[in-house]
Amino acid sequence: MAVITKIDTFAAIGAGVIGSGWVARALANGLDVLAWDPAEDAEMQLRANVENAWPALERAGLAPGASPARLHFVPTIEACVADADFVQESAPEREALKLELHERISRAAKPDAIIASSTSGLLPTDFYARAHRPERCIVGHPFNPVYLLPLVEVLGGERTAPDTVDAALGIYRALGMRPLRVRKEVPGFIADRLLEALWREALHLVDEGVATTGEIDDAIRFGAGIRWSFMGTFLTYTLAGGEAGMRHFMQQFGPALELPWTKLVAPKLTDALIDRVVEGTAEQQGPRSIKALERYRDECITEVIAAIAAVKARHGMRYED
């Protein structure tokens, strides 16, 4: 099966937070972008999101020809995907909706176009069941903000051709991303399963009055979060084992896994818990608008990525190492 390996035109189906992030990343890489979303104010919100993201993208570095002027908002799905080399769907996480969307997308798209979904946990075998030419359909699950964070989880369904996955990995790399091939179809894939465990424990700590939302965020951002930005969980614990490494760590701290510290099951989302979380995060946000916080976040991300890349280069490493 022939699939596209180099793209010039990128189609975005859905223009919410994730979809607009894809649009901004594609524009920053010098592509022509077509976008569609059924919401009445979708085009206005999309252009506002791209405008808010652009200063961070300029700091990170734009490809030749990159411009928000290369974004075209169109009235139908068919107009969006007909001439696209790569289609990225970022619709709400409802399987029935994605089944319907991908039936339409796949019939209107070019035969060799790659079709991807941003789903964070639905399985491609299921929601591509009615797709035309499902061998060119994949999942490309990004992380917010999509235009800055490099990770994208990539996997196919039972009928996806291996060549399609390989081509998608290359295209995402060309967009400045760090694609991670997911070896098996599992709900939640890799990163969100890890984040979900942390999120559940955080909610338990708030619910039981152990800590506020701000204190929990501080525990992450002044502790493990700093290490995680350049050295993940397993390598961090390898160092904790000293010269003997991971085997010593597992022998010394492995029994602690049996201690009943964590809850793991989701807490009941009572009105009281929801109110406590909302009030806590409102206090953290203070008078700053969401757009202002996004700009602050984006500047932090670009500076952190640049700093890590510089240190790795001095140690003879690539950023993705």
UniProtKB/Swiss-Prot annotation:
Biological role stated in the UniProt entry: Catalyzes the NAD(+)-dependent oxidation of L-carnitine to 3-dehydrocarnitine.
Query: Which Gene Ontology terms describe the biological processes this protein takes part in?
Result: carnitine metabolic process; catabolic process; fatty acid metabolic process
Pfam families, sorted:
3HCDH (PF00725), 3HCDH_N (PF02737)
What name does UniProt use for this protein? L-carnitine dehydrogenase
SUPFAM superfamilies noted in UniProt: 6-phosphogluconate dehydrogenase C-terminal domain-like (SSF48179), NAD(P)-binding Rossmann-fold domains (SSF51735)
Question: Quick one: which pathway?
Answer: Amine and polyamine metabolism; carnitine metabolism
Under the heading HAMAP family, the entry gives: L_carnitine_dehydrog
Gene3D superfamilies found in the cross-reference section: N-(1-d-carboxylethyl)-l-norvaline Dehydrogenase, domain 2 (1.10.1040.10), NAD(P)-binding Rossmann-like Domain (3.40.50.720)
NCBIfam families for the chain: PRK07066.1 (NF005471)
**Positions that bind NAD(+):** G14, A15, G16, V17, I18, G19
Q: What Enzyme Commission number(s) apply to this enzyme? A: 1.1.1.108
